[in-house]
C-alpha cells in the first residue's frame, strides 16, 4: 500500500493505492461524477484505492480533478517501478451500450498520452474536458504511455466511463505477473 499526501493552496489530497488489491474503493472528492469514474477505475483495475480530496470546487472542478490525477499517478509509479516480472504492455476495448473505447498502454517510464475521445459539453455539472486533464495528469505522473481512443459512441457518460474502464483493464493486463519476463525490455532498464 502506497500513501501519498499533497497540499496546495487549491487542494488537499490523500491517496492510498494497492495495485495488488481486489477493486475496493473509498472515494470522496466532492465531485459525484468523478467519484463514480474513480470507483469504476478501481473496480476494473482490481486496485484498492482511497482518495480524499478537499478542493476549491466552489471555483471549478479543474484543480481537484487534475491534482487527483497527479497524486494517483505518483502512487502508481511508486507501486510499480521498477517494472519486473510483469507483462508491461496491456490493452482493452470496453463497450458501454453504443460506446466503445480502446486503451493500449506501455509501462514504459516514458510518459505520453494520446487521447482521441470526442466528448464536448458537460456530464451533469462535470465539464467533459476534465476527463482528458485527469488522464494527462495520471499518465505523466505514473510515467506510462497510454493511447485512449474512441471507436464509436455518442453518450458522454458512456464514453467517459468506457474510457476509465478501458484504462483500468489495460493496466491490470500490463501488471499481470510473468516470471519469465524479468526486466521486460531489451535495454535492460525501463
Curated annotation (Swiss-Prot):
Keyword Amino-acid biosynthesis applies: yes
PROSITE patterns: IGP_DEHYDRATASE_1 (PS00954), IGP_DEHYDRATASE_2 (PS00955)
Assigned keywords, A-Z: Amino-acid biosynthesis, Cytoplasm, Histidine biosynthesis, Lyase
Gene3D superfamilies: Imidazole glycerol phosphate dehydratase, domain 1
Top enzyme category: lyase
Entry's localization field: Cytoplasm
GO BP annotations listed: L-histidine biosynthetic process
EC number(s) stated in the UniProt entry for this protein: 4.2.1.19
Pathway where this protein functions: Amino-acid biosynthesis; L-histidine biosynthesis; L-histidine from 5-phospho-alpha-D-ribose 1-diphosphate: step 6/9
InterPro entries cross-referenced by the UniProt entry: IGPD_sf (IPR038494), ImidazoleglycerolP_deHydtase (IPR000807), ImidazoleglycerP_deHydtase_CS (IPR020565), Ribosomal_Su5_D2-typ_SF (IPR020568)
Family to which the UniProt record says this protein belongs: Belongs to the imidazoleglycerol-phosphate dehydratase family.
Protein name, per record: Imidazoleglycerol-phosphate dehydratase
Gene, per the UniProt record: hisB
Amino acid at each position: 500500500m502506497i500513501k501519498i499526501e499533497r497540499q496546495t493552496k487549491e487542494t488537499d489530497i490523500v491517496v492510498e493505492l494497492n495495485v495488488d488489491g481486489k477493486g475496493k474503493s473509498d472515494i470522496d472528492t466532492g465531485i459525484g461524477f468523478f467519484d463514480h469514474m474513480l470507483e469504476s477505475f478501481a473496480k476494473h483495475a482490481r486496485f484498492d484505492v482511497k482518495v480524499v480530496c478537499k478542493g476549491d470546487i466552489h471555483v471549478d472542478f479543474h484543480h481537484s480533478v487534475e491534482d487527483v490525477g497527479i497524486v494517483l499517478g505518483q502512487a502508481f509509479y511508486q507501486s510499480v517501478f521498477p517494472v519486473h516480472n510483469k507483462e508491461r504492455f496491456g490493452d482493452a476495448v470496453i463497450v458501454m451500450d453504443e460506446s466503445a473505447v480502446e486503451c493500449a498502454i506501455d509501462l514504459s517510464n516514458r510518459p505520453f498520452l494520446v487521447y482521441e475521445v470526442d466528448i464536448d459539453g458537460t456530464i451533469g455539472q462535470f465539464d467533459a474536458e476534465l476527463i482528458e486533464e485527469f488522464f494527462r495528469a495520471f499518465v505523466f505522473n505514473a510515467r506510462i504511455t497510454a493511447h485512449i481512443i474512441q471507436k464509436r459512441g455518442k453518450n458522454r457518460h458512456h464514453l467517459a466511463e468506457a474510457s476509465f474502464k478501458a484504462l483500468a483493464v489495460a493496466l491490470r493486463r500490463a501488471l499481470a505477473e510473468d516470471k519469465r519476463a524479468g526486466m521486460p525490455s531489451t535495454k535492460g532498464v525501463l
